[in-house]
């Protein structure tokens, strides 16, 4: 089995999802040297909402934060999340701004750039990808997972191929809503390994309580299972099993 490559997301998406990105740099610094010795493939430490929150709520310089984190993690590559053409903001930015921002992030300590577009529109990823490749960064193309009549396995594979053609070094299936079931995880991992052939990350959220099982499935080489009940029925069973009943 290939060696697992784990990206720790505690100080970026972990605290963004749980604490609205309010963790200050002083809260991170004491643990960073220990995290640096764990052996993570990368530590996601920047991007997403951290840039905005540093200035809007924490009175911190986001660039200084990045440099401080890198100083404490010399042995582990740092990663950031980019919203494609939106970078770390809430609107589309010009090609020049994308180019300069990505290269500035690389100079200040970022090596792995996980880039996604909420609509899986490859046009919103192109400028990021070109800048990352120019400055020698690792381009991880992210696929936004959701469920709808048009979001099929074939559509995700098609987008994954577009990311590969754009020069992606690895692929991330980004399940930001916690909707990816263990069964679908197994199918997607095997399909991506067979047809895309790039290193693959699964980014899970624990909204529906399925993340631990998904982690088992993506590391497994067991034969495929039959189609399980729908996610709605699975959620009902999970809620029923975990409901706290009053004592009698």
Task: Indicate residue ranges for each PLM-predicted region.
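N-terminal amphipathic alpha-helix/helix-capping segment at the start of soluble metabolic enzymes
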Residues: 1-19, 66, 71
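Hydrophobic faces of well-ordered beta-strands that scaffold small-molecule active sites
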Residues: 6-11, 41-45, 76-83, 111-115, ...
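Short catalytic helix/loop segments, enriched in acidic residues and glycine
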Residues: 24-35
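Alpha-helical segments flanking ligand/cofactor-binding loops in enzyme cores
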Residues: 33, 103, 130, 161, ...
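Terminal or standalone catalytic/regulatory effector modules within metabolic enzymes
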Residues: 34-54, 238, 247
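Active-site beta->alpha loop and helix N-cap motifs at the rims of alpha/beta catalytic domains
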Residues: 47-164, 168-170, 178-182
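Catalytic alpha/beta core domains of metabolic enzymes, predominantly
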Residues: 176-248
């Amino acid at each position: 089995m290939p060696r697992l490559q784990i990206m720790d997301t505690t100080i970026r998406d972990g605290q963004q999802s749980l604490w609205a990105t309010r963790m200050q740099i002083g809260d991170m610094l004491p643990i960073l040297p220990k995290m640096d010795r764990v052996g993570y493939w990368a530590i996601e430490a920047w991007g997403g909402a951290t840039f905005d929150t540093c200035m809007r709520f924490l009175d911190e310089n986001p660039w200084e934060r990045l440099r401080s984190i890198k100083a404490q993690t010399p042995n582990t590559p740092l990663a950031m999340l980019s919203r494609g053409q939106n970078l770390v903001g809430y609107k589309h930015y010009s090609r020049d701004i994308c180019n300069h921002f990505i290269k500035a992030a690389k100079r200040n300590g970022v090596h792995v750039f996980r880039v996604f577009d909420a609509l899986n529109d490859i046009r919103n990823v192109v400028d990021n990808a070109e800048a990352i490749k120019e400055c020698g960064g690792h381009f991880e193309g992210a696929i936004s997972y959701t469920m709808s009549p048009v979001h099929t396995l074939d559509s995700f594979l098609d987008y994954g191929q577009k990311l590969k053609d754009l020069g992606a070094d690895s692929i991330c299936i980004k399940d930001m809503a916690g909707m990816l079931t263990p069964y679908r995880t197994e199918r997607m991992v095997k399909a991506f390994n067979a047809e895309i052939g790039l290193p693959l990350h699964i980014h899970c959220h624990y909204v529906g309580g399925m993340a631990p099982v998904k982690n088992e499935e993506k590391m497994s080489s067991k034969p495929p299972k039959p189609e399980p009940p729908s996610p709605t029925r699975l959620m009902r069973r999970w809620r029923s099993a975990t409901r706290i009943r009053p004592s009698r």
